[in-house]
């Protein structure tokens, strides 16, 4: 859907969805679109995973999510000299004794690359955090949270 320019005060992109776009060119186009639909001074809030940490430490499995109803397993296959990682998931539905599996490629976008793309799209006041509490970015944590403005 196309939105009018300068329509929104805030745009959100959470849940590591941005990196489903599999090239920097695609991400740049999306970010420029977000910039266009924000009102002057509007805010863009973004959350992906901290791929500097994931790649640097060769993290191959994300924390297990388990409730009384489901068990959700998430793994990464890191490929040498390839900006894409293979993201594999298994969702076990306990009551039905059924497992649904999936695999997709994600662009392992590092923090410096993301900041550069945001700047190229026109964003300013770019701040990155290690979580939604706005704790300092860096170190061994999975989230990468961004706040920036038009």
Where are these regions (language model features)?
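A short acidic, Gly/Pro-enriched loop at the edge of an enzyme's catalytic core
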Residues: 1-11
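Short glycine-rich, flexible loops that bind phosphorylated cofactors or substrates
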Residues: 2, 19-20, 53
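A short SAM/SAH-binding and catalytic strip from SAM-dependent methyltransferases
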Residues: 9-25
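Short conserved AdoMet
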Residues: 22, 39, 150
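A short glycine-rich, Lys/Arg-flanked "PGG" loop and its adjoining helix->strand segment in the class I
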Residues: 28-40
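A short hydrophobic/small-residue beta-strand
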Residues: 44-45, 125
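SAM-dependent methyltransferase
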Residues: 45-117
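C-terminal lobe and adjacent flexible extensions of AdoMet/dcAdoMet transferase-like proteins
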Residues: 107-150
């Amino acid at each position: 859907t196309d939105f009018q320019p300068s329509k929104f005060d805030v745009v959100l992109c959470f849940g590591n969805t941005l990196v489903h776009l599999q090239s920097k060119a695609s991400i740049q186009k999306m970010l420029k679109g977000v910039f266009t639909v924000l009102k002057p001074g509007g805010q863009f809030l973004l959350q992906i995973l901290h791929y500097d940490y994931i790649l640097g430490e060769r993290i191959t499995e994300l924390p297990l999510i388990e409730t009384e109803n489901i068990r959700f397993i998430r793994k990464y296959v890191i490929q040498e000299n390839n900006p894409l990682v293979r993201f594999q998931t298994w969702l076990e539905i306990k009551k039905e004794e059924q497992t649904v599996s999936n695999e997709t490629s994600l662009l392992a976008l590092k923090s410096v690359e993301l900041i550069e793309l945001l700047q190229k799209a026109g964003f300013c006041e770019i701040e990155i955090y290690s979580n939604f509490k706005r704790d300092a970015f860096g170190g061994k944590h999975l989230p990468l949270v961004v706040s920036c403005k038009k």
